[in-house]
Amino acid sequence: MEKGRRVPVLLITGYLGSGKTTLLNKILNNRKGVRFAVIVNDIGEVNIDADLIAKDGLIGQGDDSLVALQNGCICCTLQMDLVNQLVGLMEGDRFDYIVIEASGICEPEPIAQTICSIPTMGPAAVRNGIPYLDCIVTVVDALRLQSEFGSGKSLTVKNYGEEDLENLVVQQIEFCNIVLLNKISEVSEEDRAMIKETIHALNPGAEIIECNYCDVDFSELLVTHRFDFGKTATSATWIREIEKEIECPPPHNHHDGGLLYTSDAADE
């Protein structure tokens, strides 16, 4: 293995049912000679997403190379499991790309922190190369955003609690490079405009790609070099507003008183 080898990682996030597994399957089916390793995380004891990938014919049931990170979340309880899998994938020149499908309840920022911390974990962690985060794609169900979140209006109201679904959806939109606006044909032009306006308000730096059934040009998602932790972490509108206040403080008055599945395209 050549020292200093770097392998790009695509992180796919999004709430349950948004289309993450559909996107993953389509990437694998259109790999065009790219050797992928895939890590799939499902919060339940049975990894439904991994089963769907197997059902799609990309892998066989009982394949020893199919390992799912399950019964936990890679943004918290399974962070070191994720590190160990990524480090293990760097052994041998077996693949060109790593795709991670996060659980629908995962917050993307802690996952990004975990991946980006691998180079600081000592020589053993990087002896075979370094997996680096290339891009975070959040898949958003346009119809659900329209029907359950008022075309996104409820996401811009900051009175929801930390454990509320709105908070999770907002975090997934705010901390990404690309928003894949899926099922777009199922909403009206008016709702589409409102949804895009909301997404842009939450994350002005994210590119919005409209699609149905996650049919996209995969060259827009792979080898993008889009991810920069500092820029992504400060792309959210509320953070930008705080930064503006710090840069331009108001006049001051004195007063008293936080699957692993390896696919070798050569076998096709």
Task: Annotate each predicted stretch with a short phrase.
Residues 157-263:
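C-terminal accessory "lid"/substrate-recognition subdomains
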Residues 264-268:
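A short, hydrophobic C-terminal helix/tail in secreted or cell-surface proteins
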